């Protein structure tokens, strides 16, 4: 838990002194409270987000699907037969494409899905100061769809790109950026507003075939993060 308080002076414009406490250390800075739609608590995180934004114009909140990516509620179940495969909260089964009215453009593509709920106790750190963010991360093949239990992060023409995105979402870098906006257990496209879009083709400046730890280090270098910022993540 914790306590956050402020004094509001309604007729004053300008910067506000902000003091944060992390692991017994206090940091102070002058902040513009209206600079962003969301207020980032830790000053270290502000610097990281600023570096990411200075190197990217497009973020994953423009790619992640809305709730109900295929228009199917959580309680929808597979049919006895169908030309599609439906992923729902208890597994997979047949479904008919004639019943799909939303997300048709994604059906034939390779899709990466996540649960619309974060991992248990999201927002709370463990003894090492780490947070669990994504509770489910799967790939749907062409002709596979899902209920609103899941969000489609992105859809691709090739399996190579989908696998690269899957690796990207496993990095500490991405999960840290999601955590800054994931204050509740519900995930939505808005929570990906700090996650920079990447090139997942073979022409990418990141080698997605490497280990997750190595991909993390490539991303840290790409966005010019310092040793202290990497340690904070």
Regions found by a protein language model. Give the residues of each.
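Short, amphipathic C-terminal "tail helix"
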Residues: 228-233
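C-terminal substrate-recognition regions of SAM-dependent nucleic acid methyltransferases
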Residues: 2-149, 154-206, 210-227
